[in-house]
Every structure is written in C-alpha cells, then in structure tokens.
Amino acid sequence: MMVYLDTSVMMRKLQREAGSLREWGQWERAYSSELLRVEVLRTIDRTRLRGALTDREVADLVEKARTIFDGLDLIEMTQSILNRASQSFLTPLGTLDALHLATALRLVESGGMDLTFLTHDTELATAARSLNFKVQGASGPA
C-alpha cells in the first residue's frame, strides 16, 4: 500500500496519543509534503514554549521526528502544487490542509499511483474522499 500522511497522523504517533493510526508503518511507501517537517517541528517548539515539554522531551520528540522524516518521501512544494492548493475544492479546507491535498493529488497525477490518504482531521478526510482518495485514520462523520 502506498500512503500519503498528513501532520495529524505523525503528531499523534509522536505524542503516543489515543487513537493513533493502528496501521502505522504497514505500507510499502509513504509520502508527505515537505510542509510536514515544518508543521511537526513548529508544533514541538510551540508546545515547548508553552511549558508543556521538558528539554529532554523536546530532544526525544525531535529525534523521533527526524527518524520518521528519513523514512518518508517528502515532496517539494512546487509552483503547480501551490497553484492547485489555491484553487477551489469541493468541501471547505484550510490552507495547510489544501497544500497537503494538492501534494497528494500531484503524486497521483504524475505517477499514476493509488494512494491511501492518512489523516485524523475529519475536514481533510472529507475533502480527500471527495476527490476519490481512500482515507484511513479519521473517525466520526467524515
């Protein structure tokens, strides 16, 4: 199985939160946008600045994140991805989610691959389903 994962999936895994994706790592190949690295590291730093993480916890999370990044194919944010993210989608979608979805669309269009979209975000899951992606990870009315 080929997958595209968004930041919500990686953050739940890193933080060992309830509801983490059970199928973690059970894929042939995993893709994400280079945006993932920025979002994950910013989230860790923001949490640190709020006093919710010790220095040791930050170091552990960053080390685990880098290990995960090394196992992913991170896709460059190209002009065509930015252009597609700027266009309308069938359902409401925020900017960062639109960038993730546009990246997954570019992978499918350029490589003819069948991707499963991994997200815990129900709004992003709905948008991905509206574009015929198989979606895993989102619960509730998506």
What are these regions (language model features)?
Residues M2, S33, R106-A142:
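Acidic, PIN/NYN-like endoribonuclease modules and their adjacent C-terminal/linker elements
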Residues Q26-A30, Q87-L93:
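A short glycine/serine-rich beta->alpha loop
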Residues T67-T91, A98-T103:
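Acidic catalytic patch
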